[in-house]
A protein has these predicted regions:
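Short amphipathic alpha-helical segments and their helix-coil junctions
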Residues: 1, 94-108, 154-160, 186-196
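N-terminal secretory signal peptides
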Residues: 1-7
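N-terminal export leaders
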Residues: 9-14
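Secretory/endomembrane lumenal or extracellular ectodomains immediately following the signal peptide
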Residues: 29-112, 230, 235-240
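N-terminal hydrophobic signal/anchor transmembrane helix of membrane proteins
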Residues: 79-81, 94-98, 117-134, 155, ...
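Histidine/lysine/aspartate-rich catalytic loop segments that bind and position anionic ligands
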Residues: 138-166
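Acidic/histidine-rich alpha-helical segments that form the ligand environment
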Residues: 161, 165-208
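Acidic, carboxylate-rich catalytic segments that either coordinate divalent cations
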Residues: 193-195, 204, 216, 220-240
C-alpha cells in the first residue's frame, strides 16, 4: 500500500504530466502572478521541486498530517496550503520557520489550550483567514470552550471572556490582546499573567515566542493571499 506521501507525489506527477498541459509544467506566468487563478505563488508540487524543497515538503507532510486534515494540508495540485507553500518555495529559510512552529507545538512549556488562545489572538489581529480556519479546530480539540470562539474572533475585551475561558486562558488572552493592540504589555498585565502561569518565566518566554512565530506566519498568509479549501467560509468575510 502506498504511503500518504507517495500518494501525494503520484497526484503531483499526474498534474505535471500531459494530462495537465505538459511534463513538469509550472503554471503560466499569469497564474504565477495571480491574475489567472488568484495565486501569488505557484503550487510547489513534487515533480518540480529541487532536493532541498523536496526534503522540506516531505518533512511538512510527515509532521502536519498528524495535526490537520488532508483537505487543509493539500491543494488540488498536490501542493501545500497555508504557510507551507511559501516555506517550500524558499527552503533555506522556510525550514527554520517550520522547525520553530513545530517546536511551539511539541516543546512548549504551555499547555496546548493556552498557546492556541494566543495564536488565535494573533490571527484575529492580522485577520489571517487560514490562521483562524486551521487553529480554531486545533484549539477546540485542545479544550478551549466553544462559547469563547465568537468572542475571540471579534477581539472582545478580556473581561467578556471571564466565565467562558478558564482563568489562566483569560490571562493569556488579555496579555496577547494587549500586546497586539498596543505593542506593549503593562506591568499589571504582565504580573497578572505570570501569576496565572505559576510564576514561571519559561512559560512567559514561550508565550512571547509563540506569538512571534505566528505573527510571522500570519503576515506570510496575508502577503501571499493564501486561500482556504474550496467551499470553506471565510472567518473574516469583511476582509475578503
Amino acid at each position: 500500500m502506498l504511503s500518504l506521501r507517495q500518494r501525494v507525489m503520484r497526484r503531483g506527477l499526474l498534474c505535471g504530466s500531459i494530462l495537465c498541459g505538459g511534463a513538469h509544467a509550472r503554471p503560466s506566468s499569469a497564474a504565477a502572478a495571480g491574475s489567472a487563478d488568484g495565486r501569488r505563488l505557484p503550487p510547489m508540487v513534487p515533480p518540480e521541486l529541487d532536493d532541498a524543497q523536496q526534503r522540506l515538503y516531505n518533512t511538512i507532510v510527515d509532521t502536519r498530517i498528524k495535526v490537520i486534515s488532508k483537505d487543509a494540508l493539500f491543494d488540488e495540485h498536490g501542493g501545500l496550503r497555508g504557510p507551507w507553500n511559501p516555506e517550500v518555495a524558499s527552503p533555506a529559510l522556510g525550514q527554520h520557520l517550520e522547525r520553530l512552529a513545530t517546536a511551539v507545538r511539541t516543546e512548549n512549556s504551555l499547555e496546548a489550550r493556552l498557546y492556541e488562545v494566543a495564536i488565535l489572538v494573533v490571527g484575529v489581529h492580522w485577520q489571517a483567514q487560514f490562521e483562524w480556519y486551521a487553529h480554531e479546530k486545533i484549539a477546540r480539540k485542545a479544550g478551549v470552550a466553544d462559547a469563547a470562539f465568537p468572542l475571540m474572533k471579534v477581539g472582545a475585551p478580556a473581561e467578556r471572556l471571564e466565565g467562558v475561558l478558564r482563568p489562566d486562558e483569560v490571562a493569556v488572552y488579555k496579555l496577547a490582546l494587549e500586546l497586539m493592540e498596543t505593542k506593549r504589555v503593562s506591568a499589571a498585565t504582565y504580573a497578572e499573567t505570570k501569576r496565572a502561569l505559576g510564576d514561571d518565566d519559561r512559560k512567559m518566554a514561550d508565550l512571547c515566542m509563540t506569538m512571534g512565530c505566528y505573527s510571522a506566519v500570519s503576515k506570510m498568509l496575508n502577503m501571499f493571499e493564501i486561500a482556504l479549501p474550496q467551499g470553506e467560509p471565510l472567518p473574516f468575510p469583511d476582509r475578503g
